[in-house]
Amino acid sequence: MAPTMRKTHPLLKIINNSLIDLPTPSNISYLWNYGSLLGLCLMTQILTGLFLAMHYTADTATAFSSLAHICRDVNYGWLMRNIHANGASFFFICIYLHIGRGIYYGSYLFKETWNIGVILLLLVMATAFVGYVLPWGQMSFWGATVITNILSAIPYIGNNLVQWVWGGFAVDNATLTRFFTFHFLLPFLIAGTSMLHLLFLHETGSNNPTGLNSNSDKIPFHPYFSYKDTFGFMIMLAALALLSTTNPNLMSDPENFTPANPLVTPPHIKPEWYFLFAYAILRSIPNKLGGVLALLFSIMILMLIPSLHTAKQRSMMFRPLSQLMFWSIIANTLVLTWIGGQPVEDPFILIGQISSALYFILFLVLLPLTNWSDNKMLNL
């Protein structure tokens, strides 16, 4: 019998080994769909972004009105803009669920895959931040001013660094044009890094809900999981279409419908909802440098999780105390998200400080401690 082309052709062979004949554990749940959903989000964002970039002008004088032009005069421009803006929210929903799945089922023990995943999270956050500046509304301008200003906390070179990033003495035209450049460039860097993420994942194979070796029970990715992923695609695209057509401004700040004005500061400067937990941690520390370090560490702490794994079992499926800690982390992160959107006044300041301290204590102390306790409880 003649050899199958998909198994012999140099290029098709890579696709075949990644998407068709890939041996996959038979018991992975829908929580394993978020990786492919993130790929779909990235493709959607790149495509809609490309069409938006054809009509957008990265200039302080015309950026805001070019957005109005896209929404009013360009064929389906309103839809492209709404899908792109809400697609970012869906991107972060998927990425947070993907990370949560990784923590719960011990997928972080694939260290290279996990660390590249954390780098991907940082890249996605950077892309979303520079993208939020582009409409040049009030929150775009002041968000850019506040967040880039945190670089000034770096000792000795801080002020020079901020002015270097701004391209002047304030957030202005030079800042907008370079942010547009970064926003265009970074998604392609994310796509390339995602390939590395998959490369390392396919070196080990997927984890599964039990955390046990599944080599004795593998099935081909296609048709079983390709159809399962397609079902996930349909649900997510339907939800994105529904949000983008019926309530497109649900996630956005009304302040951003006012053109940027350096002379008028909005009453409450806050980022999009997906950054609020980190923003709450930044705000809860009175010292500027301390706040910046806490902000950075709130994400980089994910890289420490593999080193803090003290359990004898990989997955939390059979570890009740660790499950309690996991859901405490989720609840605490939701509290931080709520606090990040509130004004800086009592009782929110105190709640934010307690939640921020608890965030680090849960990850660094209580999670390893409960892992160890579970070992004792289960006589391992």
UniProtKB/Swiss-Prot annotation:
Cofactor note: Binds 2 heme b groups non-covalently.
Main location as per UniProt: mitochondrion
Localization of this protein: Mitochondrion inner membrane
The protein's required cofactors: heme b
Organism lineage: Eukaryota, Metazoa, Chordata, Craniata, Vertebrata
Function: Component of the ubiquinol-cytochrome c reductase complex (complex III or cytochrome b-c1 complex) that is part of the mitochondrial respiratory chain. The b-c1 complex mediates electron transfer from ubiquinol to cytochrome c. Contributes to the generation of a proton gradient across the mitochondrial membrane that is then used for ATP synthesis.
Membrane-traversing stretches: 34-54, 78-99, 114-134, 179-199, 227-247, 289-309, 321-341, 348-368
GO molecular function: metal ion binding; ubiquinol-cytochrome-c reductase activity
Binding site for heme b b562: H84, H183
Assembly, per entry: The cytochrome bc1 complex contains 3 respiratory subunits (MT-CYB, CYC1 and UQCRFS1), 2 core proteins (UQCRC1 and UQCRC2) and probably 6 low-molecular weight proteins.
Miscellaneous notes: Heme 1 (or BL or b562) is low-potential and absorbs at about 562 nm, and heme 2 (or BH or b566) is high-potential and absorbs at about 566 nm.
Membrane topology category: Multi-pass membrane protein
Family matches, as Pfam families: Cytochrom_B_C, Cytochrome_B
Classification via SUPFAM superfamilies: a domain/subunit of cytochrome bc1 complex (Ubiquinol-cytochrome c reductase) (SSF81648), Transmembrane di-heme cytochromes (SSF81342)
Gene Ontology biological process: mitochondrial electron transport, ubiquinol to cytochrome c
Residues annotated to bind a ubiquinone: H202
Species of origin: Typhlonectes natans (Rubber eel)
Keywords: Electron transport, Heme, Iron, Membrane, Metal-binding, Mitochondrion, Mitochondrion inner membrane, Respiratory chain, Transmembrane, Transmembrane helix, Transport, Ubiquinone
Protein name per Swiss-Prot or TrEMBL: Cytochrome b
GO cellular component, one term: respiratory chain complex III
